[in-house]
Amino acid sequence: MNAKTLLLAACAGLTVAGAAPVLAQPDVPLIPRQKIFGNPTQVAGRLSPDGKWLSWIAPRDGVLNIFVAPAADPKAARPLTAETKRPIRQYFWSPDSKQILFINDKGGDENFLLYGVDVVAGAQRALTPFEKTRVQVVGISSEVKDRILVGVNNRDARWHDVHSLDLKTGKLTPVLINTGDYAGFLADEQLVIRGATKSRSDGGSEFYRVVNNKVDAQPFEQVTLEDSQTTSPAGFTTDGKTLYWIDSRGRDTAALIAQNVATGAKTIVAENARADIGGAMANPKTGRVEAYAVNYLKNEWVPIDPRVKADLDFLKSKLTGEINVTSRTDADDKWIVAVDPVTAPTTAYLYDRKAKTLTKLYVTRPELEGAPLVAMHPVEIKSRDGLTLVSYLTLPPGTDPDGDGRPNKAVPMVLLVHGGPWGRDAYGYNSTHQWLANRGYAVLSTNFRASTGFGKKFISAGDLQWGTKMHDDLLDAVDWAVAQGVTSADKVAIMGGSYGGYATLAGLAFTPEKFACGVDIVGPSNLNTLLKTIPPYWEAGKVQFYKRMGDPTTPEGQALLRERSPLFRADQIRRPLLIGQGANDPRVNVAESQQIVDALKAKNIPVTYVVFPDEGHGFARPQNNIAFNAVAENFLAKCLGGRAEPIGDALKPSTAQVPHGAEFAPGLAEALARK
């Protein structure tokens, strides 16, 4: 494997629906938004492959940049990059430890380019200096130090051609020109392309061998639509003799499979009846899997290698919280370990495997140490048709004195819906949960059908169910919370981004009496126009979208998508709505928000619309995220009666524009006047 850590990224109870909601204890301090959503102090620590350097992301003049320090002297850190607009959020070390490579886009357009910075000299250069191009890393190896493989879609925006990138000269050499409509490529540790994948007409995939940069005429593996979200190759061992798969074929949950490349024989390495195998730790020298992750209610690392088992046992004995190994040297003598206590900010440590010592490197948000952060409670909720919905509940501080995961009296609640929809909510520190709980709300995040991590049947149960059974799962979660005494039926808001934004619009339009208000962030309102405006580089996944959502190329599909689109039932919306949108969003075009705002305006239905001209699918710049959340918490306070930090001057450093409805959000018009 060419990555040190492979990411694959009962309801009985007393009904108190009529009880008056109780808010958080008044003596609980209000945590300032800046402390929760401002820049972290340090994050994303990495060790260079040779172990001589430490790196991390930290603010420089208010923008997240990369810092480096000698591993022996972390206090001698210096900034390596000097980004002034977009924060750097993804980076990695070159195999020779001489450069740090990072990707960034412009204004949230997701046209990510690759940059390299010399660690000693500090010289930075664009390694893929193209316009309207999105780079992919195809191969990076601990065996080949002087180059990597990248995919670049500057020839045809739909498909990536594979190039070899010389890390010293920056020269790009074509390796495989993708004229066969292949969705992706797989390289081994010698940076030889060994596999290619292509979409099938049923929404599944087929996998081809590649020999001498020529793709075989016939596939060697087939994956149907049912397995398409849960089956893919995961990487080779260093000797190239074993190919690992995450594979749900012949089972429900995805197992970790080892395939003998020469014979094709497959061996089950790990499987779990309740959850997919969600990740693996591979030895940086051999590429062999040494531990795997299972994430049902919580993420659990299960060791295979006895030495790694001893390491994980030691770490568990010394650290309290969710433990993740985030970086390993090539010699595998040093690790960076992150621990998430949930009720405190994440801390990173340098772990010396031989000496069995832990050295504290940093706390991601030291300003939150000692803050009134609260526990997250995993719960299982039954849907009306018998599915188990793994969910996470956070309660306001002071409302659960016995710690049983239920408040002593009902409190207002925010149903926080994840995006994707092919993603999931998980256990761990969650800034939005903590923020809303601090303001006096219970927060419930539910993995509705179509969420990933719980097997292919659970995903497929969401096919063609946007706004219907997927929405029913959210309604069932609210009913569970009411029945459990968590909240009362008239004090529930719905909020989310991307699919969660769609769910918010659907909640207010399809079930107009269910929610007291809604906060939609970059959510689509018209599923037909959503599918017509997806980015060109999503071409390979388009058929799967059509099979799982509805086909906009057929009359029947168009009718289904129209029926499930909140835009066409906007006149049913009765409750307050706040919409946030990035103007450069390549996934959910700004028109998705604009058209429902226009429809509501035409019917004189109140809506507040906040747009950020320098953002895309979400708000990457902390100034903008804080500004929107300032509006949101005051909006929710009016709707649900919780606490709020006044908007104040939160909009001043942001690019927030409010084309419509400032008068419907408390304090917004005044904040705009001061901007």
Model-derived segments and spans:
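Beta-propeller domains
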Residues: 56-82
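Bacterial N-terminal signal peptides
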Residues: 9-18
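Cap/lid segment of the alpha/beta-hydrolase catalytic domain
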Residues: 364-493, 497-498, 503, 525, ...
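Mature N-terminal segment immediately following signal peptide/propeptide cleavage
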Residues: 26-61, 65-66
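Bacterial N-terminal signal peptides that target proteins for export
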Residues: 1-8
